[in-house]
């Protein structure tokens, strides 16, 4: 028993050492480029799947093994780690950092909640719409971490009252008391502590528990007091921090007034994770999965100019919209029942006392933000401007602004995002007051030299691990192509040629949907993209017909807490159990799979010309064989 425990403690080290040694006969006994490339690919994939080393570190394996085995030169491998998509991500993160710093996302979220009211059905729809909207532009993890504190505050208001009469009798007392997490109370609730931007606590540093599949297991989200109380700040600079009791105390102390209250908490919590996933599908920059697909596709088929921000949005927006509505019905039916008339009524006469109190609390939180600030207006303007420039660069149906330049093809979506992101480092955060003196303010503050975002803000938000991970995927794909491994894999799949194209795509989608529940999304798509490209070329199927649905289905890792970080964040709040996630997530998975398959076979065909085998795929196939 002691030996077994010792092996379990060092299992990661054993994997790191034993896997390369056990696979070493492959390139030694078969000294070919294909075998050497397969060796590197398998070692890297095992490291990714097992989490024996961090995902970013495992992505560096091709950087030294490819040159060592003579698959690619060192400078060729290095070039794969920084691509056009990396610059696109840099620019987007600059805008995202500004949104998070000045709490523009919170203003949008609270405003939408105020519009919906406190009826469970409308509240569910509102939070799902809000999360989807934010997740289009911010990472799914960041969006979930931003919205969940607001959801938790609303939930605690909904479950803290015993009944209407009790709330009515003690309304003055309840309004005077702050929401706290005093363990002595019979009903623990959420405490919102606002910490200024200089606080060192952030989601990354707090997710320090043992990782499962690259997803941190959160047992105690952000729990930091303001260390800089002497510095006065605009309310929009404050960040909502959440204190939750430990899982054991949650089990003992969290009580729901009724089964209905418990179902509301489960429903709202899970819906945040699902709607973040749905929103991430909508834009090409919504998830790292889409970015990896875009860069791999552009590298594999450089002559194909069919996928950009505009075309992806035109295809995916109807999918997200339909998924959002159907998922709302599914979650409502599963947890709240079919009484839509009662739970979705907007009539003020039908609102209970505690629903009115909840709305009042949300109104108070919104009023704390004050009037919209100058940095918020600048950030919102840049946000809208970036989206408009992306859409109008090459809309497809009319000439875009890129056609005004003499040289074509030099500008991409990354050009726009990096330019606007660069400007955010220059524009002052304080509105210029020309010809006016700011008496009573210190000289540094009155000069207004602090920009909208600083490099420190950018560093806190930039996901460098994803950048290296994506680069490792490009390196693997490049090695597979140059060594001929992709062609060999494609030839082994000729047995699938008897199946119709839609069946091949469906099987691929089901396969990745299962794998991605246990393997991280970036690792899954990085492994499958080269294989599916070879499969499509071998079967003479338009590669987009397979790649786009698979890319979307990889994002549907919604059944387990380890599926993706949003699931882990939601699960950490303690409202739902794994069986709840599996039951609800299975329905969302099926909904997404059906809608994606319908979309790719209807408007996807006309948008991407999927009914023909394109010339750019033939050119790539000839190049691989050569």
UniProtKB/Swiss-Prot annotation:
One of its GO terms (molecular function) is transmembrane transporter activity. It is found in: Membrane. Keywords: Ion transport, Membrane, Sodium, Sodium transport, Symport, Transmembrane, Transmembrane helix, Transport. The keyword Signal does not apply. InterPro entries: SLC13A/DASS. The chain crosses the membrane at residues 13-33, 52-72, 77-97, 113-133, 274-294, 309-329, 372-392, 414-434, 466-486, 499-519, 543-563, 590-610. The keyword Ion transport applies. It catalyses: sulfate(out) + 3 Na(+)(out) = sulfate(in) + 3 Na(+)(in). Residues 217-252 are annotated as: Disordered. Pfam families: Na_sulph_symp. Transport is inhibited by thiosulfate, phosphate, molybdate, selenate and tungstate. Not inhibited by oxalate, citrate, succinate, phenol red or 4,4'-diisothiocyanostilbene-2,2'-disulfonic acid (DIDS). GO terms for cellular component: plasma membrane. It is a multi-pass membrane protein. It comes from the Eukaryota. Residues 217-228 have a biased composition (Polar residues). Sodium:sulfate symporter that mediates sulfate reabsorption in the high endothelial venules (HEV). Belongs to the SLC13A/DASS transporter (TC 2.A.47) family. NADC subfamily. This is Solute carrier family 13 member 4.
């Amino acid at each position: 028993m002691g030996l077994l425990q010792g092996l379990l403690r060092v299992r990661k080290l054993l994997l790191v050492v034993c896997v390369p040694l056990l696979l070493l006969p492959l390139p030694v006994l078969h000294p070919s480029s294909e075998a050497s490339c397969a060796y590197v690919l398998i070692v890297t994939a095992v490291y990714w799947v097992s989490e024996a080393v961090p995902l970013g570190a495992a992505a560096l394996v091709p950087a030294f093994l490819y040159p060592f085995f003579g698959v690619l030169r060192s400078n060729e491998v290095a070039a794969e780690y920084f691509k056009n998509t990396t610059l696109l991500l840099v620019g987007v993160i600059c805008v995202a950092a500004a949104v998070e710093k000045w709490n523009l996302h919170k203003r949008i979220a609270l405003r939408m909640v105020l519009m919906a009211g406190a009826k469970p059905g409308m509240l569910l729809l509102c939070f799902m719409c809000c999360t989807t909207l934010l997740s289009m532009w911010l990472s799914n993890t960041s969006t979930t971490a931003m919205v969940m504190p607001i959801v938790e505050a609303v939930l605690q208001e909904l479950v803290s009252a015993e009944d209407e009469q009790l709330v009515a009798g003690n309304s003055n007392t309840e309004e005077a008391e702050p929401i706290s997490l005093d363990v002595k109370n019979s009903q623990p609730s959420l405490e919102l502590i606002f910490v200024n931007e200089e606080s060192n606590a952030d989601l990354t540093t707090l997710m320090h528990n043992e990782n499962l599949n690259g997803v941190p297991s959160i047992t105690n989200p952000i729990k930091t007091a303001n260390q800089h109380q002497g510095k006065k700040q605009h309310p929009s600079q404050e960040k909502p921090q959440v204190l939750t009791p430990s899982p054991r105390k949650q089990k003992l102390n969290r009580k729901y007034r009724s089964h209905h209250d418990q179902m509301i908490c489960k429903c709202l919590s899970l819906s945040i994770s699902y709607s973040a996933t749905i929103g991430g599908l909508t834009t090409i920059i919504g998830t790292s999965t889409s970015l990896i697909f875009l860069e791999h596709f552009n590298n594999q088929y450089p002559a194909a100019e069919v996928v950009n921000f505009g075309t992806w949005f035109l295809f995916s927006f109807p999918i997200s919209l339909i998924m959002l509505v159907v998922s709302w019905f599914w979650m409502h039916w599963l947890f709240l029942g079919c009484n839509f008339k009662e739970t979705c009524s907007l009539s003020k006469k039908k609102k209970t006392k505690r629903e009115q109190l909840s709305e009042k609390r949300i109104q108070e939180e919104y009023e704390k933000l004050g009037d919209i600030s100058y940095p918020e207006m600048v950030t919102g303007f840049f946000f809208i401007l970036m989206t408009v420039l992306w859409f109008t660069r090459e809309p497809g149906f009319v000439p875009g602004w890129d056609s005004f330049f003499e040289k074509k093809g030099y500008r991409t979506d990354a050009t726009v995002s990096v330019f606007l992101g660069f400007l955010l480092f220059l524009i002052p955060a304080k509105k210029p007051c020309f010809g006016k003196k700011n008496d009573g303010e210190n000289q540094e503050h009155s000069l207004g030299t602090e920009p909208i975002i600083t490099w420190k803000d950018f560093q806190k938000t930039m996901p460098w691990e994803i950048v290296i991970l994506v680069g490792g995927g490009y390196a693997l794909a490049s090695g597979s192509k140059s060594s001929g491994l992709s062609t060999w894999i494609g030839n082994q799949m000729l047995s699938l040629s008897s199946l119709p194209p839609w069946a091949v795509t469906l099987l691929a989608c089901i396969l990745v949907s299962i794998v991605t529940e246990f393997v991280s999304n970036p690792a899954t798509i990085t492994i499958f993209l080269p294989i599916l490209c070879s499969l499509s070329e071998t079967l003479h199927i338009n590669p987009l017909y397979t790649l786009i649905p698979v890319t979307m289905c990889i994002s549907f890792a919604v059944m387990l807490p380890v599926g993706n970080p949003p699931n882990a964040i939601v699960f950490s709040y303690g409202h739902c159990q794994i069986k709840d996630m599996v039951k609800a997530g299975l329905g969302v998975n099926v909904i997404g799979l059906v809608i994606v398959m319908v979309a790719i076979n209807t408007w996807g065909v006309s948008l991407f010309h999927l009914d023909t085998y394109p010339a750019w795929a033939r050119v790539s196939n000839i190049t691989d064989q050569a």
